[in-house]
Amino acid sequence: MTDQPVPDFVAQERERQAAFFAARQPGEAGFEGSAYRLPPENRLSNLNPAIRDLAARYFDDNAIAWHQHAAHGLSSQVCCLNFLMPLATHPDMLARLVQSALGGDLPEMLEVEKGPDGEAWFVGFEWVGSENYLNEWPPTGKPKRGANVTSADAVLRFRQAGKMETLLVEWKYTETYGSPPQAKSEPERLRRYQAIAFAPFGPIRSDAGLKPTELFWEPFYQLFRQ
């Protein structure tokens, strides 16, 4: 008996998204000859219909940047929104989700920010925090969520075992990595992160023998900043 070949995940998901668009939104896909892509101006059609208006207003209200390929069927930003935004006003469901991921007692979900209609939201998206923890913000003004600064794909807050916790979510779909860091980016990255990368000032063990530049390879670069 021979093993069946494992289908390429990216190719498989392209086919699935193309079939989905053809069935649910006939005639809308096909941007640049790809059946799994919508025209950029139709990015909201890539969202769950129940959250399209909500997402548009939330992004506008908070001046959040849409990813360049938000109209792509394999957009991880859109995938994250489709899964988590419908739960933003359902702390009971989010509590069970957090418990299943982290274990422990059922947490009490805490408000992250207000939604477009002024209601409490228990999930935030493209989150940059309230202070310039990573030395990334512009000299004047606030950073733009989702662009040019580290932005968590989603954030949740909860209380569990008497402690308040913040959970940052890094959402992936079909991303791949392999290209080396660009040398021209190294000086600025060192300025930002060198003093805050290693314990006791950062998340990386200081006795592991790592150099700051070794953290600039993806996907480790994203993970250590969050």
Question: How does the language model describe each region?
Answer:
Residues T174-Q226:
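Acidic, metal/cofactor-coordinating or nucleic-acid-engaging core segments within structured domains
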Residues N135-D153, R205-P212:
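A long, hydrophobic alpha-helical segment
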Residues M1-N132, E136-K144:
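Nuclease-adjacent, charged terminal/linker segments that flank catalytic cores
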Residues D153-F158, E165-Y173, Q226:
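Conserved catalytic cores of phosphodiester-cleaving nucleases, focusing on short active-site segments
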Residues P86-M93, R157-E165:
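Short, solvent-exposed loop/edge-beta patches enriched in aromatic
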Residues S75-C79, G146-A147, L215-L223:
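Phosphate/oxyanion-binding active-site loops and adjacent basic polyanion-contact surfaces
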Residues S130-N132, A161, K172-T176:
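Short, solvent-exposed loop/turn segments at secondary-structure junctions
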Residues R96-A101, K144-R145, V149-V155, M164-E165:
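The feature marks a conserved, polyanion-engaging helical scaffold used by nucleic-acid processing enzymes
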